[in-house]
């Protein structure tokens, strides 16, 4: 679990959980660095070959993780590196759903990542692919395109989405728009200039 500088009761709850669950590991940021930084911290600390991610607001359903694993195991692709959740029935406000639909459409068209819902926090990603990702703020919104940029395959799986019962979102529609435009241009630049050279070593006769 990555605590991104929480100012509420999260540290206390995590301390109690540590005492109760021996396998739990908690990584704490001294201040808020953002969702992308939290993901990078988790990726680097992970010990398994695959990493499952989900947001801490309770809207992602952990019970969907086996569904992602099943999709990975059932895919006939050796280059598969990312399984993304797709919140077909989002439990958000109408304004947020409309904004997300437009943003996803523009992003998917420009980046050609074939991902209808890149903002879903529920994902399963190969740790090796995680460690090759470029590190920049808001990169979590473009994981499918970034994985594809490095030569990995991605697929989407429909997942559950639950209503928010507490707290509030740190993402507004207006700030997402302008930041998203800048980030999209940057990712498009990265994707078009990706280098994946291949070579074979000559053997001595």
Please describe what each predicted stretch is.
Residues 190:
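Negatively charged linear elements and acidic catalytic determinants
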Residues 3-12, 58:
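A conserved acidic beta->alpha catalytic loop
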Residues 1-2, 181:
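Hydrophobic targeting segments
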Residues 16, 23-45, 50-53, 62-141, ...:
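Acceptor/aglycone-binding surface of glycosyltransferases and processive sugar-polymer synthases
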Residues 152-159, 173:
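Conserved alpha/beta core of the MobA/IspD/sugar-nucleotide pyrophosphorylase nucleotidyltransferase superfamily
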Residues 124, 132, 156, 194-205:
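Short linear elements at protein peripheries
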Residues 149:
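A ligand-binding cleft/hinge motif common to bilobed small-molecule-binding domains
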Residues 20-23, 153:
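Glycine-centered tight turns that cap/initiate beta-strands
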């Amino acid at each position: 679990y990555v605590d991104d500088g929480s100012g509420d009761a999260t540290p206390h709850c995590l301390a109690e959980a540590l005492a109760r669950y021996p396998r739990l590991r908690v990584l704490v940021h001294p201040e808020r660095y953002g969702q992308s930084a939290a993901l990078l911290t988790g990726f680097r600390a992970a010990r398994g070959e695959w990493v499952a991610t989900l947001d801490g607001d309770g809207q992602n359903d952990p019970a969907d993780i086996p569904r992602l694993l099943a999709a990975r195991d059932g895919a006939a692709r050796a280059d598969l590196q990312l399984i993304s959740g797709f919140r077909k029935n989002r439990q958000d406000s109408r304004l947020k759903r409309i904004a997300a639909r437009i943003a996803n459409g523009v992003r998917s068209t420009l980046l050609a990542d074939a991902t209808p819902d890149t903002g879903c926090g529920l994902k399963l990603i190969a740790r090796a692919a995680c460690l090759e990702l470029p590190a920049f703020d808001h990169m979590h919104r473009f994981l499918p395109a970034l994985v594809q940029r490095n030569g990995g395959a991605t697929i989407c799986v429909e997942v559950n989405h639950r209503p928010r019962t507490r707290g509030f979102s740190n993402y507004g529609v207006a700030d997402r728009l302008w930041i998203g435009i800048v980030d999209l241009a940057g990712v498009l630049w990265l994707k078009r200039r990706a280098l994946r050279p291949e070579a074979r070593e000559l053997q001595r006769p």
